Amino acid sequence: MNYFEFFSLPRHLNLDVLALEKQFYVLSRKLHPDRFAGKSAAEQEAAVAQSSLLNDAYRTLKDPIARTQYLLTLEGVQLEEQSKSATDAARATGGQKKQIVPPELLEEVFELNMQLAEMRANKQMGEDEPELRRELLTAKDAFDEKMLQTQLDLDTLWSQWDAAIDSGDEPAKLAARDAMVALLNKRSYLRNLVRDVNEALE
């Protein structure tokens, strides 16, 4: 049983979060361990497992990005791992975390990497270059703006996905799915860029 089925929901991305929360509390009371105190060990274990599933499902579905990522995995999509934890883990083992640069960001990323390398070199020598710092802050602001636009684009795609699910329009569903994958990967990459700039400016 997947998380949507657990809450008796269609695979929609625009959910009524308040209704979801209300249902969560109803199910939480129903599955509370105290209600199974006099039951068999098997029933108690089943209740604990259901309660754990409930918590995981609610935590995932109440967050729109986590909800989208989860739905895409249900659709058989493997998202690019570009999280901070994955990147840090690669660094800790001496490896290099491979990140796929969104094509539209190639030029900006190339320039940013040069600026970051210069900033790190300056810090190692105990120097500070105000102009370079201003350039990095400007770049960070630009990436923050792109993050906001990415969120707006995702909002549109969520509605397109839901409409395709309701109408059974498979081509529209696949188009929305592929576009969401690209946007989530772009969002993840942008977050890492902003983090790198913040670390360089510390």
Language model features with spans:
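C-terminal accessory/regulatory regions appended to core domains
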Residues: 1-202
